[in-house]
Structures are given as structure tokens and as C-alpha cells.
Amino acid sequence: SPEAMRRTLDEMAHTTLLQLFKEKPEARALFDKSAGYAVFDSRKVAFILAAGFGRGVAVDRSTQQKTYMKMASVGVGITFGVGNFDNKIVILIQEQADFDTFISNTQDARMDGKAILGDSKEEASGSFVDGRKYYVLTRKGWAVTASVTGVNYLRDDYLN
């Protein structure tokens, strides 16, 4: 049911944020400065053509209004590794206007994905890049980047 799915997504988002703050304490300062955030549970299938899908929830920090969302990605190459596996994505969004755009069915075209494979200079900076910060929980732990892969984020009409 939609209610059960919303509860599951809310619990996943809460648990993922707690894990992020415990394992990457510096993320808390950016979270506190953000206008909103989104947490997705995604499954990646990555061989030559990488594809991914998932669901999540975006939260406006000023109102606590939740928007349930779907995500889908397609790219060429091995972006997240070989095989079929899950990961969690936390997106911190700095400005309210950017958050509002994000929850209004958006395609994130700023992607490069390289930082997901290892540490990056962006991780050390502790700041937003182009108004966002992405934390990706992979099998190896948290990776930090300014972007993920070419991803469509869409409002989930079934859950909203």
C-alpha cells in the first residue's frame, strides 16, 4: 500500500541519515545549512550499459514537507562497479530554489561519477559544490561527490 511504502521510505531515510552522521560527522554541518535533502535507496545494474532505479523521499527542512520520489539512471560504462547491488544516496541541497526545482521532476545532468569510485578533493572541502553535496553509501562505505550519474528524479504520483 502507499502508506506502507511511505513508512518504509521514511524509516530508510532516517536510518541512512543516522548512519551518515555517525560515519561522516562533517556531513552534519552541511545538513544543518541545507534547505532540504533527499535520501534514495537505489539498485544499480552496471555492466557495459549502467542502469539504476530507486525510490526515496525529499524533505524541505523549513516545513518538514515530504515529497516521495523515484529515480532512474542510464549511462555508459561501469559507474558503480560490476554486478547488481544496492546503495543509498543522500543529497543535501543548499538553496530553497534549487530544492524546489529538484522536487519538480528534474534531470540531474551535472554528473561525472568519478568520486564514487574513491576519495575525492570534494570530500575534504566540506562544502557544497554547485549547491549540492552527494553522499553515496556503497559496499566499501561512504563516497562523497558533487554528483552521481545522469539521473532523473521524478515525483512519485503513487506515493504523493
List the model feature ranges, each with a label.
Residues 1-160:
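Small-residue-enriched, tightly packed secondary-structure blocks
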